């Protein structure tokens, strides 16, 4: 969790990932754990999760009122109700868990942030996080190419701000995949800073070992053109881009390649450069970065420090995490904390 992780310590300590799994299995949703400790319903259907929650609501005789909340009603420093399009709903406790501004087709359009701001809360700038990245053309050239087990370094101007290992994919607009989505969470200053990526295509090999590998391939293909000498080392689709980046004439015979040229190729293989134009729109982001300032919320109960009886949960808060189910766990843990505290309101 790259931002405001400490705020979540209390909520996570009382309801963690194991508690979440036990909860849903108790609701009749069998789960499975896949690569990377990612947990899914055995059915692979997200619908089974929402259906199980709805069954629990009905069992607990919870009333579901389908209306669009317009504003909070606040009296004497505390919540007194919610005003909707169809009328007023009196309440001594209200939980705002309206999500972020990603995926607006789901109804998550940022109205909760507006209501929080009207109640006096600070809402930090809203941006897309876990979002694909646009580049200046390499992605379109390599569209459809997926690279597994590569290293990634993100540079903000010339300063290294993030490094990781995993899988990425080139698309018609740029880059995506788990590695790129997590990296995007650290790229928050587009317009103020320049970002570029360095992809280590052979992270399992240090430069000396990779150089020996190149020498072996060059000996094998010594009479070939350079552009035809990398087939054992790289995916076919990637080779023209590597040749271009190396600066070596694609028709140069391998036996004529100098030691200095080979060292340049080695640098490209360990630091293949991609200049980033910017993120894709926030509507394409998996989660929203930014939200209600956590310093204005009690971390144990999720209650507002400014308005009595007002609670927050999930993506409306200024907390977001990497891909891998962490953002869902934030929703479960903060939702439970807010729900228990709100239920105890007089």
What is the predicted role of each segment?
Residues 93, 100-119, 318-346:
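A conserved FAD-binding loop/helix module that cradles the flavin
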Residues 71-94, 148-158:
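Conserved beta-strand-loop-beta-strand element in the redox core of flavoprotein oxidoreductases
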Residues 29-30, 122-127, 132-256:
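An anion/pyrophosphate-binding glycine-rich loop and adjacent beta-alpha core
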Residues 65, 69, 82, 88-108, ...:
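Short hydrophobic core segments
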Residues 1-63, 68, 170:
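Conserved N-terminal/central alpha/beta ligand/cofactor-binding core
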Residues 65-71, 240-320:
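A glycine-rich dinucleotide-binding beta-alpha-beta segment and adjacent secondary-structure elements
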Residues 39-46, 129-138, 279-296:
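Flavin (FAD/FMN) cofactor-binding core of flavoprotein oxidoreductases
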Residues 1-15, 177-178, 206, 210, ...:
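Catalytic, metal-anchored helix/loop core of enzyme active sites in primary metabolism
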């Amino acid at each position: 969790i790259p931002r405001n992780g400490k705020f979540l310590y209390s909520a996570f300590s009382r309801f963690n990932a194991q508690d979440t799994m036990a909860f849903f299995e108790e609701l009749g949703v069998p789960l499975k754990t896949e690569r990377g400790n990612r947990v899914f319903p055995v059915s692979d259907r997200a619908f089974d999760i929402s259906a199980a929650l709805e069954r629990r609501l009905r069992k607990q005789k919870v009333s579901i009122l389908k209306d669009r909340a317009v504003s909070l009603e606040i009296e004497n420093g505390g919540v007194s109700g919610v005003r909707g399009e169809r009328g007023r709903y009196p309440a001594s406790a209200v939980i705002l868990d309206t999500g972020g501004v990603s995926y607006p087709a789901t109804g998550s359009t940022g109205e909760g942030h507006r209501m929080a701001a009207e109640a006096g809360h600070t809402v930090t700038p809203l941006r897309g996080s876990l979002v694909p990245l646009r580049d200046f053309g390499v992605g379109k050239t390599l569209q459809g190419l997926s690279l597994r087990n590569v290293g990634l370094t993100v540079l903000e101007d010339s300063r290294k701000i993030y490094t990781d290992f995993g899988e990425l994919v080139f698309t018609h607009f740029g880059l995506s995949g788990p590695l790129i989505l997590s990296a995007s969470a650290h790229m928050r200053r587009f317009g103020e800073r320049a970002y570029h990526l360095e992809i280590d295509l052979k992270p399992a090999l240090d430069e000396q070992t990779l150089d020996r590998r190149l020498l072996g391939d060059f000996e094998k293909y010594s009479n070939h053109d350079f552009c035809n000498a990398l087939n054992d080392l790289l995916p076919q689709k990637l080779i023209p881009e590597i040749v271009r980046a190396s600066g070596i004439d694609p028709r140069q015979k391998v036996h004529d390649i100098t030691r200095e040229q080979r060292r340049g190729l080695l640098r490209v293989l360990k630091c293949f450069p991609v200049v980033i134009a910017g993120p894709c729109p926030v509507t394409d982001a998996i989660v929203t970065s930014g939200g209600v300032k956590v310093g204005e919320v009690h971390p144990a109960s999720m209650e507002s420090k400014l308005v009595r009886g007002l609670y927050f949960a999930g993506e409306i808060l200024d907390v977001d995490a990497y891909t891998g189910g962490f953002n869902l766990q934030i929703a479960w843990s903060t939702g439970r904390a807010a729900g228990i505290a709100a239920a105890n309101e007089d």
